[in-house]
């Protein structure tokens, strides 16, 4: 798809040639799904594996939690903003399979079973995601899918599941890991139901082998590369740095139907300052990441909600070109505490983020110029600059010789759209 668009003349040739990290070929899992990064809600980071509904009725992993989240997604504008997948993570299962080896939800916490929950979710226009594992057990120790890939794929399809997050704990050997992912992907396709497959294959395979992203993208709609996100700036920073260091292999793998997954958005929780929440949102959009929030939609500040629901920012993430953004080398090496990323958009536009990585002092000024962009060739004579974050502001046309002073808070980000 990338290649077709590039060759269709939608891009100036200088721009194409200047971009060493632009993918020349993307072959995503051929199920026609996730043509833009999946958006939704996933329980893990915020709710973990709380199974005691007596003591923790408000936050235990139960059908009630998901029904409440489904209602919030519809009535609080999340679905309208694009967040469609309501996803269950680990700890939904009963400790054993049933007499026919079929998976079953914990009967106390999910008395209606997953089918009933799927109906509830679908009735509201949402889609349901579920979690399983390629190995003998899930990471939290519940029954895994090993030896039951076909049966489990069929069970999920029968229940009306729309997305499977497929983890890699207890995988056995590398061959078993890779084979398990292939088999589950094929089995899901064979059910005939549209089920997005979200993998963790590269995360588990990386210590043992060089990850073949072409192959991963043939079997998965998205895949995790790094450790779990936590509710902290150090975690968000680490994910950004990892992604930037490996961008030459990660960026070409991404495209419609196939996404690198830097893990959940933790905006609206406890650990990130306002500026750090802006940074996570801006950079997850630049990275064309799945936007899967893990927060409590029943209790979220108006600011975090507005940030997560910002339609123009989401549009950067959901741009149909499906290009993953990348960190651009600075031409202002004397000041390496600013970090710039750019993401090509359709219609010959760019999204650009400017992060102040200094963790001391106050707002710092950067004299932004379009010549800082990759090879500086996207704007022929002048570009129209719109700031989308932290607040919306139109700066109008900027000549390529002109400089725009911008002030960025410590650990904060300015997100620009350049047309
Ligand atoms: C792994 C995954 C997490 C989460 C937990 C659940 O750590 O990477 O995202 O799914 O397992 O146990």
Where in the sequence are the language-model features?
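Carbohydrate-binding surface patches
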Residues: 284-287, 292-294, 333-377
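Solvent-exposed beta-hairpin/edge-strand motifs
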Residues: 371-392
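Aromatic-lined carbohydrate-binding/catalytic grooves of carbohydrate-active enzymes
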Residues: 46-55, 61-62, 67-173
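Catalytic cores of secreted or luminal carbohydrate-active enzymes
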Residues: 279-332
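Structural recognition of the beta-strand scaffold that forms the well-ordered cores
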Residues: 38-43, 82-89, 127-132, 162-167, ...
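C-terminal beta-strand-rich structural cap/linker in extracellular carbohydrate-active enzymes
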Residues: 396-419
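N-terminal signal peptide
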Residues: 2-3, 13-32
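Glycan-recognition surfaces
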Residues: 148-151, 196-296
């Amino acid at each position: 798809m990338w290649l077709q668009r590039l060759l269709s003349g939608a891009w100036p040739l200088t721009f194409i040639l200047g971009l060493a990290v632009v993918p020349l070929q993307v072959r995503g899992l051929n199920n026609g799904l996730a043509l833009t990064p999946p958006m939704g809600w996933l329980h893990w980071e915020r709710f973990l594996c709380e199974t005691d509904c007596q003591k923790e009725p408000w936050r235990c992993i139960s059908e009630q939690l998901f029904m409440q989240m489904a209602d919030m997604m519809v009535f609080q504008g999340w679905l309208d903003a694009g967040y469609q997948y309501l996803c269950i993570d680990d700890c939904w299962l009963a400790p054993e399979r049933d007499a026919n080896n079929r998976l079953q939800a914990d009967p106390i916490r999910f008395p209606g079973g997953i089918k009933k929950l799927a109906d509830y979710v679908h009735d509201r226009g949402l889609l349901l995601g579920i979690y399983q594992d390629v190995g003998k057990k899930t990471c939290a120790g519940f029954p895994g899918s090993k030896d039951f890939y076909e049966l489990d794929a069929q069970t999920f399809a029968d229940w009306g599941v729309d997305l499977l997050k497929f983890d890699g704990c207890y995988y056995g050997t590398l061959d078993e890991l890779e084979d398990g992912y292939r088999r589950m992907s094929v089995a899901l396709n064979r059910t005939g139901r549209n089920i997005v497959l979200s993998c963790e294959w590269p995360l588990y395979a990386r210590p043992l082998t060089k990850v073949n992203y072409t192959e991963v993208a043939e079997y998965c709609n998205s895949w995790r590369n790094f450790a779990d996100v936590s509710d902290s700036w150090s975690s968000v920073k680490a994910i950004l740095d990892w992604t930037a260091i490996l961008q030459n292999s990660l960026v070409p793998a991404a495209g419609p139907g196939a996404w690198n997954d830097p893990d959940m958005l933790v905006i609206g929780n406890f650990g990130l300052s306002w500026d750090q929440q802006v940074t996570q949102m801006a950079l997850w959009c630049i990275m064309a990441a799945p936007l899967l929030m893990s927060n409590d939609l029943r209790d979220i500040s108006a600011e975090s909600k507005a940030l997560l629901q910002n339609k123009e920012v989401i549009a950067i993430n959901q741009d149909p070109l499906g290009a993953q953004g990348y960190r651009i080398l600075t031409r202002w090496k004397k000041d390496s505490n600013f970090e710039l990323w750019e993401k090509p958009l359709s219609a010959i536009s760019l999204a650009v983020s400017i992060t102040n990585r200094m963790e001391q002092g106050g707002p710092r000024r950067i004299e932004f110029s379009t010549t800082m962009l990759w090879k500086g060739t996207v704007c022929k004579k002048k570009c129209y600059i719109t700031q989308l974050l932290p607040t919306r502001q139109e700066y109008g046309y900027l000549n390529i010789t002109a400089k725009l002073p911008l002030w960025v808070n410590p650990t904060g980000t300015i997100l620009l759209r350049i047309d």
